[in-house]
Amino acid sequence: MKKLLFALVLLFSLTPAFAQQKNKVRLQAMYDSIKAAGILHPEFVMGQCIQETGWLACKKCCLRYHNLFGFYIKGNKCKKFTSETACIAYYKAWQDKRYLKWQKKHPKQDYYHFLKSVGYATGDKYTRELKPKVEWVKKNLRL
């Protein structure tokens, strides 16, 4: 029984790592698209994409609507996009509208603070979950 329990714990602990490696080519391509769009702080934004889509592998999230970043519209409904490219363009416009203005007022703050300030990150829990993903991006993708 202990061996079975150990095997299950091991299996579930390795599943995220397997998903990361399995999707690494797709994750790199997504990062490259984010960077090519001219989005600022692409490593953070890629971390958001990973957070919101479960490493680009979720089945019951906004990804089915090409929504890479968990944007919602009124009524708490997932915003739908025609393509991942359209979603990335939307993020770029969303960031352009907010970030530089915010940065002028808060020059010493980081992107985590920006996300919280504009209401994207709803609390400290989101930041705690996002940080390891951003670190993974910095360590494992070509920036």
Show where each model-derived region lies:
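Bacterial Sec-dependent N-terminal signal peptides
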Residues: 1-22
